[in-house]
């Protein structure tokens, strides 16, 4: 990884960078002795939630499309609350969603659930119509900004899947947190494409709860253990 040489490269979130003039003043001033430069922006990266560098200076970004679209928020369905609180497992939650968003209730669902999979029915299958992404950004020429953007992985879209809210590369693996799982994506040769995707821990988030209150802050601790926070 190239030395920083007193320059701070910042990945600006889309709500800052979108539509902004590239020559405009930065949104805030860095500390004295540092320079603020744009490292990546749309369309190279979009809707970032979390990011982490690997030991080769490559940046992995968790991008969400499910947040605010198909990640159910119990506040929008107060009549579901009591039944939702009775869920004790992901299988319970899956059955609950399939009951509340059945084909028979398509007309009622249409008031709030778009036909994401375009099958003419507003049901639980529409929750599977939008996928999450892990983006890989690189600066192989050490130019000071990302010159290569590739899609590392796209998926995580079952009806019970929440928001991809954590990503952490480690020793040829890329770990990702998205309700209801902690995932490991194997890329031992650092090709930029996983050769295997497996759930290493399952069962988080048995209630609909609040949209976006998911599994965040994925890190490797000094003891070699994986840590992350869990929302409601």
Residue ranges with predicted function:
Residues 1-2, 231:
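A compositional/structural signature marking long, glycine- and acidic/polar-rich segments
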Residues 3-15:
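Bacterial N-terminal signal peptides
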Residues 18-232:
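Beta-propeller domains with acidic blade repeats across secreted/periplasmic ectodomains
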């Amino acid at each position: 990884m190239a030395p920083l040489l007193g320059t701070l490269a910042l990945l600006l979130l889309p709500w800052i960078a979108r539509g902004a003039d590239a020559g405009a003043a930065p949104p805030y001033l860095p500390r004295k002795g540092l320079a603020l430069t744009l490292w990546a922006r749309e369309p190279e990266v979009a809707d970032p939630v979390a990011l982490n560098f690997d030991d080769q200076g490559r940046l992995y970004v968790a991008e969400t499309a499910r947040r605010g679209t198909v990640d159910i928020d119990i506040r929008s369905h107060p009549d579901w609350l009591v039944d939702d609180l009775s869920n004790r497992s992901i299988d319970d939650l899956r059955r609950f969603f399939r009951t509340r968003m059945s084909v028979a209730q398509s007309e009622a669902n249409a008031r709030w659930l778009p036909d994401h999979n375009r099958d003419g029915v507003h049901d639980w299958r529409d929750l599977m119509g939008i996928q999450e992404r892990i983006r890989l950004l690189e600066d192989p020429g050490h130019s000071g900004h990302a010159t290569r953007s590739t899609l590392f992985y796209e998926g995580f879209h079952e009806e019970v899947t929440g928001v991809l809210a954590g990503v952490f590369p480690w020793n040829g693996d890329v770990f990702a947190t998205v309700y209801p799982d902690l995932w490991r994506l194997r890329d031992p040769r650092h090709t930029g494409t996983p050769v295997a995707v497996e759930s290493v821990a399952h069962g988080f988030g048995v209630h609909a709860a609040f949209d976006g209150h998911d599994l965040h802050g994925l890190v490797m601790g000094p003891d070699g253990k994986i840590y992350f926070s869990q929302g409601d």
